[in-house]
Amino acid sequence: MHTIFKASIMVAALAIAGSATARDGNYTPVGTWKTIDDASGKPKSLVVITESNGVLQGKIDKLFRAPNEDQNPKCDKCAGASKDQPIIGLVILSGLKYDGKEWTGGEITDPASGKVYKSKAELIEGGTKLQVRGYVGVPMFGRSQTWVREE
């Protein structure tokens, strides 16, 4: 009986420690992420994700552009306060909250089209990659991108 009690306490302690560390270190999307262009497979931008009061926000920190391209483009297709704002510094990911497995309930903006989609994100491959999905209505009707954590 005493051994079963000790084992139960050990299992409970490990479960609590595991859930606490699940969002520590690489198990949080907070940090810098490299986005990859779907067509070319080349790096497109760096997005810095921050967390405030349990809500994630992602802002474009850097663009990887050819020398002959505008190095500081504006979001001319965006609406509202983002209209004609520089893409560098633009908040493209907002409102994501952790639900125990992934971050859901947010929005993502595509600066190329100016469209805003519902969004969710999930850490994969031990926290080295972030699967970001933008969708209309339900997640089934959308598109995913895999972002790579910058070290």
Predicted regions and their residues:
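Short, linear, compositionally biased motifs with a strong N-terminal bias
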Residues: M10-L14
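Edge beta-strand at a domain terminus
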Residues: G127-K129, Y135-E151
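N-terminal signal peptide c-region/cleavage motif recognized by signal peptidases
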Residues: A17-S19
